[in-house]
């Protein structure tokens, strides 16, 4: 019985929300890979998404804290020689380090799933994750300035 923390980011508002996903909904995420898109309707109990919105898996981390890496196939743990993100940020240019990473497939040993909302192309409504009144005012001013 997997339990996941789903961190859902909203590209319109720039905000993120965290949800606790348990069975049977968690079983729908098992087997998905980084980059896969699923219908946003499955999260109707947690957040109201606009019609036609999808959720794109962008990453995650395992129970030991190792990040999921798109280049490692399957739900495995591997040591890689990392030169940069994801999983390692070198202090100097050219530095490399052996790091433990997870594969690109979600399994029972994944604890956190990172995802982003993919809006329909013709969507122009408010963001799914609400923002404050001041931030909304700034956002509308930027859009008006860009339109001019």
From Swiss-Prot:
Q: Can you say what this protein is called?
A: Small ribosomal subunit protein eS6
Write down the InterPro entries for this protein, in alphabetical order. Answer: Ribosomal_eS6, Ribosomal_eS6_arc, Ribosomal_eS6_CS
Q: Name one GO biological process term.
A: translation
What NCBIfam families does the record tag this protein with?
A: PRK04290.1-2
Pfam families registered for this protein in UniProt: Ribosomal_S6e
Protein's UniProt keywords contain Ribonucleoprotein: yes
Give GO MF terms, alphabetically: structural constituent of ribosome
Q: What is the lineage of its organism?
A: Archaea, Thermoproteota, Thermoprotei, Thermoproteales, Thermoproteaceae
- Which domain of life does this protein belong to? Archaea
* GO cellular component assignments: ribonucleoprotein complex; ribosome
Q: HAMAP family this protein is in? A: Ribosomal_eS6
Under the heading PANTHER family, the entry gives:
40S RIBOSOMAL PROTEIN S6
Q: Which family does it belong to?
A: Belongs to the eukaryotic ribosomal protein eS6 family.
Keywords of the record: Ribonucleoprotein, Ribosomal protein
- Which species is the source of this protein? Pyrobaculum arsenaticum (strain DSM 13514 / JCM 11321 / PZ6)
């Amino acid at each position: 019985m997997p339990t996941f923390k789903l961190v859902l980011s909203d590209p319109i508002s720039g905000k993120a929300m965290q949800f606790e996903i348990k069975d049977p909904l968690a079983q729908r995420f098992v087997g998905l890979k980084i980059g896969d898109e699923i219908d946003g309707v499955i999260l109707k109990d947690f957040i109201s998404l606009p019609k036609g919105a999808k959720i794109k898996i962008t990453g995650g981390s395992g129970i030991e804290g190792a990040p999921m890496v798109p280049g490692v196939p399957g739900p495995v743990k591997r040591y890689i020689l990392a030169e940069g993100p994801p999983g390692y940020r070198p202090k100097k240019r050219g530095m490399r380090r052996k790091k433990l990473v997870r594969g690109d497939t979600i399994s029972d040993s994944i604890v956190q799933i990172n995802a982003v909302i993919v809006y329909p192309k013709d969507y122009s409504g408010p963001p799914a994750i609400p923002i404050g009144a001041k931030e909304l005012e700034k956002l509308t001013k930027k859009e008006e300035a860009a339109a001019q």
